[in-house]
Amino acid sequence: MKTLPKERRYETLSYLPPLSDQQIARQIEYMVREGYIPAVEFNEDSDATTCYWTMWKLPLFHATSTQEVLGEVRECRTEYPNCYIRVVGFDNIKQCQSVSFIVHKPNRY
């Protein structure tokens, strides 16, 4: 019997091919348009039991454009190329994380 190769799956959109910068920008544009507060997080491990990731700087409370958030993603990629990097969107009305997706995976995977 032939089985599928084991691949690591992560959060939202993980069953799709890696997102291009343009697709990441569209996801971030949606977050900003909906009023979510974007933040960039990174971690060396992507294990599903890892609940706490390190936050890159502070959340972007006053972000009004996609380029502000993408700039922080680029800086984080440069500083931590061997880490997983994700963008999260916090809903300040519901007081919870509403959106989360990985924007960078290390070359080892």
UniProtKB/Swiss-Prot annotation:
Quaternary organization: Heterohexadecamer of 8 large and 8 small subunits.
| Compartments in which it is found | Carboxysome
Q: Which UniProt keywords apply?
A: Bacterial microcompartment, Calvin cycle, Carbon dioxide fixation, Carboxysome, Photorespiration, Photosynthesis
Q: What's the name of the protein?
A: Ribulose bisphosphate carboxylase small subunit
GO (cellular component) term, any one: carboxysome
> SUPFAM superfamilies per the record?
RuBisCO, small subunit
Q: Which cysteine residues pair off into disulfide bonds?
A: none
Instruction: Fetch the Pfam families from UniProt.
Output: RuBisCO_small
Q: Describe its function.
A: RuBisCO catalyzes two reactions: the carboxylation of D-ribulose 1,5-bisphosphate, the primary event in carbon dioxide fixation, as well as the oxidative fragmentation of the pentose substrate in the photorespiration process. Both reactions occur simultaneously and in competition at the same active site. Although the small subunit is not catalytic it is essential for maximal activity.
The entry sums up its family as follows: Belongs to the RuBisCO small chain family.
Q: Which domain of life is it from?
A: Bacteria
GO BP of this protein: photorespiration; reductive pentose-phosphate cycle
Instruction: Note whether Nucleotide-binding occurs among the keywords.
Output: no
- Note in the entry: The basic functional RuBisCO is composed of a large chain homodimer in a 'head-to-tail' conformation. In form I RuBisCO this homodimer is arranged in a barrel-like tetramer with the small subunits forming a tetrameric 'cap' on each end of the 'barrel'.
Chief location bin:
other
| SMART domains xrefs | RuBisCO_small
